[in-house]
Amino acid sequence: MSHIRVAFAPLDTNPSTCGLETFATQIETLSQMMTAEEMKAELYDCVRRILREQKFDQIRENEAMLRLYKVMGRSSTNLKGRGIYEQLFKKDHFTGSLKFYLQWAEECGKDQMLEEFKDVLKLARDRLSERIEMTAIESGFRDLVDEYFNGESGDMFTRPDETMDLFRFNAGSKKKRRSSVCFLQHNVPINNSGKAAFGPKTKTDLRQACIDRPNYHGISIEEFRFAKWKDTFGEDVDDDYRKRKDSGVVFVKHQVIDTDRQAREEVENRFNANLNPRRRHLSPVSEKTVDDEEEKRSRIYSPLVATKDAHRPALRSKIENPPATVTLSSDTKSASEKDVSDSDDADDDERLKIMTAGRKDGNPPDRSTSISSNYSTASARTSKSGAGLDLMAENKCLEAHAMFSDTVHLASEKTMVLGDDSVFVPERSLATTQIVTDFSVLCDPDPTMTITQERPKKVSNGLNVVYDEAAEPEESQKVEESEVQPEIVLVSPVTQTSPATMFNDIYDDEIEFGFFKPSRGNFVTSTPAQGVHLVNIDEYFGNKEEESTHEQEAPVFVAPTSSTFSKLTRRKSLAANQAVQPSVTESSKPERSDPKDSSIDCLTANLGRRLSIGADEIPNLTENNESEITGCKIRRRSEIIKQGDINPWDETLRKKLMCLVRPPQNMHEFQERAPKIQALRDCEVSGEKLHIQTLIGQGGYAKVYRAVTDDQRTVAVKYEVPSCSWEVYICDQMRNRLKDRGLELMAKCCIMEVMDAYVYSTASLLVNQYHEYGTLLEYANNMKDPNWHITCFLITQMARVVKEVHASKIIHGDIKPDNFMITRKIDDKWGKDALMSNDSFVIKIIDWGRAIDMMPLKNQRFKGRAGTEAFDCPEMVDGRSWTYQADYFGFAATMAVVVAGKYAQLTGASVGDYSLNVDIKRRNILRDACYDVINRFLNIPSCDSLPDWNILIKSFSEIWNEKFEASGWRQAVSKFNEACDLAANQK
């Protein structure tokens, strides 16, 4: 007797449902051990008996028989699986079974018969809709579509009774989590009046309606509170709600609190379990602001200890001997009353002799006995005013300020003519005052000296003069003066207008009220800047009327009467001033170069709202003889930047660029002080009241609050001190340039929009759109193991956005995870084509305070470091020229955070060896593509051979199209949306 006969014998003896299920299980096992021909002969005979003999009538249409028919379909050569189910349907067998239709549809899916699949789905709807919910019917068919038809359902699952849902009470949304409170309310009966006995806005006595009824145990207030807690934190409802609960027991108050505390701890533990326990929670990177408290305390009792910048380890394994320096600066002010009275030319000569004697043997002299009392700490310094009043000043020198300061390095020659670094600075009083300054708090751990000098009164910091003793004498560098140095010349727009037309234009009605009124406020952005001169708002936005009024009184620096100081250095103004400076002959006047070969092109016609300013009205940004520091190779102040390099974040340069266009219409300027902003307080700006709710973000230069306007709109308010206008300008230009290229949707969805900007004399308020789902940094912290679908989706969108930013001739300059906002959830209806769709953007790039406008700075190169920890590109580290490389490196570092969930450190020492120490799991499909991007973006040979964004986008698109799985995509979307909800709940 065969194995099939042996298995069928018990069922033949006692036909029952249990026996049929046992027989079906044995047949499924034997089908894997026997050939199709052996199985076909024996099994068909058994099934034939079940269909014909009367004793099997009770089990003939049992769903266990479908298991036998499924095995028969595998061995059938004529009917196959689909034919068997068609015959069963004709005989009206299993027409009320959902499993029957699913198995039938599965056979259609295996044969890729989509139309027959739809017919089976229609039959299932027609036969089962009266007994089974439509969502339950379609759920199984949806899985089959994902498995056999790659998720291309089209309108297959459009419910025929969608219109009826409009009239249903509380129909709910698909895939919505069950509410614990709703389950509890469902158990409460409805009273005779037809109103709910329990819930909001009801007056029913809870105990009488819910608890004290015969044969019913209702919910207690403790259970209701616990259910609401679980709803708040996304917990699923308990299925054992029908069990007996001690609802009538009244607990004391402290027991209720203990219960709530246990529930809170349980929920928090569950959420913490979703985070990756092997990595730390990432925090936003920011620029260093002030030295830490421990280091400041150490310098209080030991003033000669070098500052933090001097001890910072080099990012590359390279040994350099720093040159010995003597620093002369006007940035720090600290002196005693004795220094003011006793510092004269004789003391200066004596100090000069000591300094010179120290240089002869290469060692600086010991100053511990002579000037130890003149040192001040980094945290507080004393400055003598003209009236002899001691003023305590907080040290606001930031680390990044030291990298981008107006510092000029002198060679062995002690005199050097310096150019005026305040081209746009308004006229100041020419009166001089004696200031005794101490320089012990500068970065270089070298001996310093105190010197008395005369200089004009200025609110802003003056020019730093750093004497490099290891530098070559100036005479030896005169050979290089014959080389043509790049001169920055700004070519005006093609349309030229007369000065009269210009003055009429600036009072055009399109300009918001408040412009061109005197105001005294410093304009800086999130980019660190030291030595920022005082600029009023009229000059900042290009008001030439005020400038022409005083054009005969240009600011000058008068050389001090001290003969010793004149030996070291002197400074004169670039502007001609007959009252102070001696007349200059025609032969000695420097000639301006012809701007036809300028390295800076003019703004094109689509730059935006421009002012009519002639080229002859815009002075050069820098002169050939002016050296400027924009950074350093290993973060030392004494690094020399060659002539011709410019600081892309220089305020003078930024003002000049903003003079070429009209101010944005959403900019409002006031000359009074900015109002104070505090959480849970109302703030009124320009007649509009903002209800400040809470602080949602804070950086080194600004705070961001969530607020509600009078029309109940939730907005984000960025409060920055001092006031900043560059970010408003660059966002306006970025959006206009995208719109000019036909990318209106990207400009709306992906670029930060400043709804209103209020610029006061002391601070600025930027009102932006509020996004509750957080940033990519919060997403990386909330995701334990992100699915590659979401990672590929986000990386591709980031690349598409940054590509268009660069195509608009703008460098963002500060690309990092916390500068990408998540604007919305991913729609679960999006399919395979969502990757490259213009309607599926979910990220927006923000924080444009460090952006660089390259349209008027065509073919320019920059040197120096930005100062953002872990986001300085290799070109900044090496001291090489860079442009868009800053964004390429920021993109690679951001991609590493999204993929691996942690910050990556820069490794390598030369071009070709640079990489990021990011660990991407081997099972990650994007592993090779990510490593390739890191290698190409970190090892860029020069500014003329930048990587192509299209190659990156194409690479990730090919992986997406080849490996895409509809079911995996939906699961990834669900996790992404859960992370968005978690970020929204944390705010």
UniProtKB/Swiss-Prot annotation:
Phenotype upon changing K718R: No effect on embryo viability, severe loss of mdf-1 recruitment to unattached kinetochores and probably loss of kinase activity
Catalytic activity: L-seryl-[protein] + ATP = O-phospho-L-seryl-[protein] + ADP + H(+); L-threonyl-[protein] + ATP = O-phospho-L-threonyl-[protein] + ADP + H(+)
GO molecular function annotations of the record: ATP binding; kinetochore binding; protein kinase activity; protein serine kinase activity; protein serine/threonine kinase activity
Record: residues binding ATP: I696, G697, Q698, G699, G700, Y701, A702, K703, V704, K718
Active-site feature positions: D814
UniProt feature, compositional bias: Polar residues: 575-587
Biased composition (Basic and acidic residues): 350-364, 588-599
EC primary class: transferase
Stated role: Serine/threonine-protein kinase essential for spindle-assembly checkpoint signaling. Plays a key role in the recruitment of the checkpoint proteins bub-3, mdf-1 and mdf-2 to unattached kinetochores. mdf-1 recruitment is independent of bub-1 kinase activity. Has a role in the correct kinetochore localization of the spindly-like protein spdl-1. In addition, during meiotic anaphase I, controls the recruitment of hcp-1/2 and klp-19 to the ring-shaped domain formed between chromosomes. Involved in chromosome alignment, chromosome homolog segregation and spindle assembly.
Record-stated family: Belongs to the protein kinase superfamily. Ser/Thr protein kinase family. BUB1 subfamily.
Protein name as annotated: Mitotic checkpoint serine/threonine-protein kinase bub-1
Organism whose genome encodes this protein: Caenorhabditis elegans
